[in-house]
Amino acid sequence: EVMMRGTFANIRIRNEMAPGTEGGFTKLYPEEKVMPVYDAVVEYKKRGTDLVVIGGKEYGTGSSRDWAAKGTKLLGVKAVLAESFERIHRSNLIGMGVLPLQFVGDMNRENLNLKGSELISIIDIEKGINPRDEVEVEFKYQSGDIKKIKMLCRIDTKNELEYYKNGGILQYVLRNMI
């Protein structure tokens, strides 16, 4: 629980969903209540809501990258959608079973007008993916509008794909030992 509470709690983090706050705060939807990330995660888990993280450029840059990926997984995040990824953190996310997806071209969270209230679906992911596939992602806005875009799957190698398919590198190793 300590590591989960510490994930996304760095005071340099600015969550655009919770303007005026520093560190580990987010907004719980549909209530639009600003609260600690951990508390929001607990509530979303009770509701059965899967989570994604939306990031900017060089997502994951920092000194505690391995724990950043572990904490992200422990919080129940299924995917990270970002403009670009720090190389090692991208690999660590996959090693934890979290899907890294990269915006293509000039597409980003700003020109999609993402506020945090959108329902996000990764279309046909259950049918399987290959390294560096284009993946369709659907954003359903509170207004009812729907926007679909293509994103680049940042699982770059066949080995990484096997780790992801198994839920992470530890699960992959354990399954291959049995």
Predicted regions: what they are:
Residues 1-178:
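Fe-S-dependent hydro-lyases/dehydratases of central metabolism
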